[in-house]
Amino acid sequence: MNLIKDDRCMLAENLVRKAGKLGLDYFNRIDELQIDRKGHQDFVSEADRALEGVIRDGITAAFPKDAILGEEVGYSAGLSDYVWVIDPIDGTTNFVSGIPTWVVVVALVCNSRVIAGFIYDPIMDVMYSGYDGGGAFRNGVRMSVVALSLIHISEPTRLERI
């Protein structure tokens, strides 16, 4: 199966982008956000809930039998072999602090195996996607790794007091 053109994968990419654009709107008016504390250094905002809602609604409309596991709402059982895993704002602490290093993340699982993942950075407008057996992409361009035959380990340098 070519996962890149799979209906679920195309939907995931579209929903992650849509949620990211909504997240950017919230981020640009961060002072107006309702922010709750879930635990020490663990926050949830109305933006987290709204972004997860956009993603959940899109999944449910297109694939009503799929299960969904979201960070904010939790697990919704399904009847198919698919589970969608959602982190609507990965980096909520940064988000609520006005630090522009947060992303929207969705993974697609089939028969207990992760088959695709999508990470969207709306600040930089960069989409990362990866497919089981199909490679990884940045904005649709295949990413590659550099083959290294030897990794050089630097010697420690003593820093003298200035």
Regions inferred by a protein language model and the residue ranges of each:
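Conserved catalytic motifs of the protein kinase core domain
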Residues: 81, 101, 113-115
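N-terminal subdomain of lithium-sensitive/metallo-dependent phosphomonoesterases centered on the IMPase/IPPase/PAP
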Residues: 1-89
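Acidic beta-strand-loop-alpha-helix segment within the catalytic core
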Residues: 106-154, 158
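Short beta-strand motif preference
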Residues: 84, 104-106
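Glycine-rich, Arg-bearing micro-motifs that act as flexible, cationic patches
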Residues: 96
